């Protein structure tokens, strides 16, 4: 490894070319897409320990998009909160920055219960901790049992 220069000199022509795309990106990111009357909670220290309004919103949106009975979203895929006030496209990308897709599949009642037992008993403070929509359940971690 040989370091020829501490810094690569800027190329004014390249900067000019890239500025056009940067400006277009900035305009898209700053577009207002909504307004909130309260905070949508997605802070890692909260969403990986308990159900939140943002987790429910995302799970519900995915449930509706898939026309499913329930929606489940892993907390690790939610990366930020959205504060009260105007919401921009950038805010949306900050909370959900991955190129994930919504998956839909059919399960028997037993398969669903088996799946929920596995998901519900994942360690809190883990990205696997699930946010739910369309179901209500209680998890007894001491007994390692799920009640729906």
Model-derived features: where do they sit?
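Second-shell loop/turn segments in exported
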Residues: 43-52, 100-103
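Short acidic (Asp/Glu) and glycine-rich catalytic loops that position anionic groups and cofactors
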Residues: 1, 36-42, 91-98
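Residues that form generic nucleotide/phosphate-binding pockets
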Residues: 17-24, 28, 39, 65, ...
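Generic structural signal for well-ordered, non-membrane alpha-helical segments
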Residues: 11-14, 18, 22, 29, ...
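Active-site-adjacent helix-turn-beta-strand microarchitecture at beta-sheet edges
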Residues: 1-31, 121-131, 139-144
């Amino acid at each position: 490894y040989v370091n020829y220069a501490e810094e690569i000199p800027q190329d004014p022509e390249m900067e000019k070319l890239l500025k056009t795309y940067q400006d277009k990106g900035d305009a898209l990111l700053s577009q207002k897409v909504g307004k909130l009357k309260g905070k949508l909670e997605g802070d890692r220290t909260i969403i990986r320990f308990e159900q939140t309004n943002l987790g429910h919103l995302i799970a519900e949106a995915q449930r509706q998009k898939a026309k499913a009975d329930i929606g489940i979203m892993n907390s690790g895929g939610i990366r930020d909160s959205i504060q009260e006030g105007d919401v921009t496209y950038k805010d949306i990308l900050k909370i959900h920055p991955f190129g994930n897709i919504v998956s839909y599949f059919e399960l028997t009642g037993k398969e669903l219960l088996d799946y929920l037992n596995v998901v519900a008993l994942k360690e809190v403070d883990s990205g696997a901790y699930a946010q739910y929509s369309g179901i209500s359940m209680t998890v007894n971690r001491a007994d390692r049992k799920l009640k729906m």
